[in-house]
A protein has these predicted regions:
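Glycine-rich phosphate-binding loops that contact phosphosugars or nucleotide phosphates
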Residues: 52, 57-193
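Residue-level recognition of alpha-helical structural elements
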Residues: 1, 23-26, 52, 133
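Short, surface-exposed connector motifs at secondary-structure boundaries
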Residues: 15, 41-43, 109-112
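Generic N-terminal amphipathic, Lys/Arg-enriched alpha-helix
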Residues: 1-22
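A short, well-structured juxtamembrane/interface segment
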Residues: 22-40
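Hydrophobic beta-strand scaffold residues
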Residues: 44-45, 139
């Protein structure tokens, strides 16, 4: 059992290392875009299913409350949390519309729509990003495996090239934390950092 535990930790750390080596330049671009969006007074809408819904809720809380420093709240919302909205759309229309309808209601040009899908194939996440693009929002996808259809629709895609859902999720939350920390740094401590 001990060997298996060590193996899991090593797989997680190795995947994070290969991910950052492959995606560092796009992470920097995403930090700069998100910083500009928030500085302009626009918002971030985050969404996903299952564990990705939990990540969306978690990361929205980091923006709205605080991450590591005391600072003013930043406008972010998880579209995965309102059970009345989600179930009414799912019941009256289709589950694939649960994010796209919310984006139609809440999104404004210049906002960010951030979809999370470990498979890259979640139909409702795809349709949410598709709707966001139609409305002039900036789209960000956090995906796994080969990125799926979602990778092809987003303005910015951070794909974790793995078939292991738990390891993908571990990288996803690390990416979210890195974005929060770098945005805090750029907005409130080191605006000169590139």
């Amino acid at each position: 059992m001990e060997d298996l535990i060590v193996k899991i930790f090593k797989e997680s750390s190795q995947l994070k290392e290969s991910f950052v080596n492959d995606n560092l330049s796009i992470i920097v671009r995403v930090v700069n875009v998100m910083t500009a969006v928030l500085k302009a007074g626009n918002k971030v809408m985050i969404f996903g299913n299952g564990g990705s819904a939990a990540d969306a809720q978690h990361l929205a809380a980091e923006f709205v409350n605080r991450f590591m420093i005391e600072r003013p709240p930043l406008p972010a919302i998880s579209l995965s949390t309102d059970t009345s909205i989600i179930t009414s759309i799912g019941n009256d229309y289709d589950f694939s519309e649960i994010f796209s309808k919310q984006i139609r209601a809440l999104g404004q040009p210049g906002d960010i729509a951030w979809g999370i899908s470990t498979s890259g194939r979640s139909r409702n996440v795809f349709k949410g990003l598709e709707q966001a693009k139609k409305m002039g929002l900036i789209t960000l996808a956090l995906t796994g495996k080969d990125g799926g259809d979602i990778a092809g629709i987003a303005d910015y895609t951070l794909n974790v090239a793995s078939d292991s859902t738990p390891r993908i999720q571990e990288v996803h939350i690390t990416v979210g934390h890195v974005l929060c920390q770098m945005i805090d740094l750029k907005l409130f401590q080191r605006p000169d950092i590139k």
